[in-house]
Amino acid sequence: MKITFYGQNTLALKIGDIHVLVDPFITGNDLSKDKVDINDLKADYILLTHAHQDHILDAEAIAKNTGAVIVSNFEIANHYEEKGFEVHPMNHGGSWDFEFGKVKYVNAIHTSSFPDGSYGGQPGGFVIEGEHKNIYIAGDTALTMDMKLIPMHTKLDIAVLPIGDNFTMGINDAIIASDFIECDKIIGCHYDTFGYIEIDHEEAKKKFYEKGKDLMLLDIGESIEL
């Protein structure tokens, strides 16, 4: 499994020969828009955690370019199906075996509305089991006891957690979340994109290190392999 970070909560996963894109927000992100061309991105599937603009902005353009299947909650899937896109609707607690692996849609504590204010269903996260590697992508969320359910069904190799505070968990809660999910290898997301969520990188990594954990703050376009 190859994981590439494109800023905010945008990730590209390469699982075998399948390309999975998560929460594409590039053209509206000052940190990534001059570094990443959405026309170059490959996607067989686009996973959307919720409907906020900083998670869906480029989903339509990329789906048009690639023919990707959009996977999200029932309301978001319906929204895109009505626009003519191929979709796969899910909801909390449900799982599905896709060609790249098993995906479970799990709870997140946040809000979810489209940029026009219309209802975007309930936000969620994804647990993906693919190519003998397991990843939890939390999406935007507060710390929640529901996270303790994840290691009951999946042993994680890595997790992607929001750390920017104000709108989501901050560093301290993310450390607790990593305890809840029993995973010490964390990719940070949802930070530095705008003023409310700027963080001190060295302090954040130090706090994780002091708890025996590894916090990775990847550069735009940087990849890791599991």
Swiss-Prot record:
Against SMART domains, the record matches this protein to: Lactamase_B (SM00849)
Which SUPFAM superfamilies does this chain map to? Answer: Metallo-hydrolase/oxidoreductase (SSF56281)
Q: Which Gene3D superfamilies match?
A: Ribonuclease Z/Hydroxyacylglutathione hydrolase-like (3.60.15.10)
Hey, which family's this protein in?
A: Belongs to the UPF0173 family.
Which protein, by its recorded name, is this?
UPF0173 metal-dependent hydrolase GFO_2312
The UniProt keywords, alphabetically, are: Hydrolase
Lineage top rank: taxon: Bacteria
- MF GO annotations: hydrolase activity
| Keyword DNA-binding found | no
InterPro entries hit by this protein? Metallo-B-lactamas (IPR001279), RibonucZ/Hydroxyglut_hydro (IPR036866), UPF0173 (IPR022877), UPF0173_UPF0282_UlaG_hydrolase (IPR050114)
Originating organism: Christiangramia forsetii (strain DSM 17595 / CGMCC 1.15422 / KT0803)
